[in-house]
Swiss-Prot record:
Keywords: Cell membrane, GTP-binding, Lipoprotein, Membrane, Nucleotide-binding, Prenylation, Protein transport, Transport. Residues 194-205 have a biased composition (Polar residues). A motif (Effector region) lies at residues 35-43. One of its GO terms (cellular component) is plasma membrane. The lineage of its organism: Eukaryota, Viridiplantae, Streptophyta, Embryophyta, Tracheophyta. One of its GO terms (biological process) is protein transport. GO terms for molecular function: GTP binding; GTPase activity. NCBIfam families: small_GTP. This is Ras-related protein RABB1a. Belongs to the small GTPase superfamily. Rab family. It holds the Pfam family Ras. The gene is RABB1A. Its main location: membrane. The keyword Lipid biosynthesis does not apply. It comes from Arabidopsis thaliana (Mouse-ear cress).
Length: 205
């Protein structure tokens, strides 16, 4: 299937926060309560629609273990979007966010769009991180923020789509130069030049 743009994502965060579950729910609409730990990097893809244009998302799901961090670092380069995930029932995963974010910004493009996801919001009775704390962290660091549940699918699609919509808007607004961002690839009938030429043709009949 052809696309207007291809955006590359990376999912990061501590082990066990539900990164692989979020990806599986988004791409396959499936939830696995017991999921093998990611060894290195896993991959998923899905095409969504933004502004009536097909956008292909290629998503790399990374291992959270310290022993794989060097592998993860090499995948930051050439990513247009990052999903930074913590578990609302495990405060230590929230406390580690600053370290993950610093590493991402050190190795990735300065124009990378980052979505902060507080996962497992279906476990409200076990919550140890408040929604307000997540909102404050996102605000302080210039991130988008959502709480989600890979189990119930709450905000899973929305998180991936909102990240893409933000990247797309930044391209259209000229904040991000698609030609100089390896994580963004105009498709066969995509890109700003294509959309503007289509508009010109439309105006001329």
């Amino acid at each position: 299937m052809s696309y207007a743009y291809r955006f590359k994502y990376i999912i990061i965060g501590d082990t066990g926060v539900g990164k692989s579950c979020l990806l599986l729910k988004f791409t396959d609409k499936r939830f696995q309560a017991v999921h093998d730990l990611t060894i290195g990097v896993e991959f998923g893809a899905k095409t969504i629609t933004i502004d009536n244009k097909p956008i292909k998302l290629q998503i790399w799901d990374t291992a959270g273990q310290e022993s794989f961090r060097s592998v993860t670092r090499s995948y930051y380069r050439g990513r247009a979007g990052t999903l930074l995930v913590y578990d609302i029932t495990r405060r230590e995963t929230f406390n580690h966010l600053a370290s993950w974010l610093e590493e991402a910004r050190q190795h990735a493009s300065e124009n990378m769009t980052t979505m902060l996801i507080g996962n497992k919001c279906d476990l409200e009775d076990k919550r140890t991180v408040s929604t307000e704390e997540g909102e404050q962290f996102a605000r302080e660091h210039g991130l988008i923020f959502m709480e989600a549940s890979a189990k119930t699918a709450h905000n899973v699609e929305e998180a991936f789509v909102e990240t893409a919509a933000t990247i797309y808007k930044r391209i259209q607004d000229g904040v991000v130069d698609e030609a100089n961002e390896p994580g963004i690839t105009p498709g066969p009938f995509g890109g700003k030049d294509a959309s503007s030429s289509q508009q010109r043709r439309g105006c001329c009949g």
